[in-house]
Amino acid sequence: PNSPQWFNTGLHWAYGIEGPPQGHSFVDPETGEVGLSTSAYEHPQPHACFIQSVSDSLVGGTDSIMGLWNREALLFKYGSGTGSNFSNIRGAGEPLSGGGTSSGLLSFLKIGDRAAGAIKSGGTTRRAAKMVTLDLDHPDIEEYIDWKPTEEEKVSALVIGSAILQKHADSIMESIWSFGDDEGRFSQKTNLGLRKAMVRAINDSVPQAHIQRILDLAEQGWKGLEFESLDTDWQGEAYATVSGQNSNNSVRVPNSFMDAVKSGGEWSLYFRTERESAADEDRDPVPCKTLDAGALWDKVAYTAWACADPGVQFDTTINEWHTCPEAGKINGSNPCSEYMFLDDTACNLASINLL
């Protein structure tokens, strides 16, 4: 069985382990009615993978954006993984009903990303398992595709920057304390070594505020200054400071997009509110932006090569293979994409040892 079974199933039955209720529901086998569990382990969370819906609402319901983070936390806590398609959420600049404009999808995805990174799945050292999916016609699709590689470039900048700061701090301190004249060591006019060290630091883009801090501390008698040395370890401090590292990110690709790529055509992006209005008024939606389909496909290919995301989910093919098409459209998948089904459903994974 998959991890939630190992983490949860049988703990109450075999050992009498209980836990405070967490909002889990169960079907009473005798009455057939749904009830709330009074213990986290008496009727445990055994399902491995979930697909959850999310609406274009900040708060106010379990399917709201903030409601989804709460549901995800509950699933992660007991060892399950979850995926959602976020295409219903308005893009940056779309009008809000209460006035103003939306801050965009990425601002909300970063909240969920940070929450997932803080939770140990099943109380163990395993990270939370999370899938984020977005339709290719979403107005924030370009920013979404670039999200993870841009954040990983920030990690490289942090690693390089920490080394550069340390190198120039050492150089400036050395130029000060190796100068023989106590009165002139802090003057760039008399201490040419200090002047050269500062010029080198400025040329390497060391912020002048950092240079001034080094000088101020030296005047107070400091002989050295230690900056934290960052590295590219995925569990290190550099990666902990950036976003987009706690989910698998995928794009939903319809056949119409691939046809546009092959024909050298264009691809349109649509505000979510415009798509809803067009559907209500039985008309074609007006695009908010039009892209070269081939260029967008190249962006997907490059970022997948650069950082292994986004993954590609072929939306048309997936729904052609749908086993329950009358029940609704398949919009997303679980974190590993082996389970593709309706929103707000779950499955139990298992494996067989063939050795």
Residue locations for each model-derived region?
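Extended catalytic cores of very large enzyme megasubunits
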Residues: 1-355
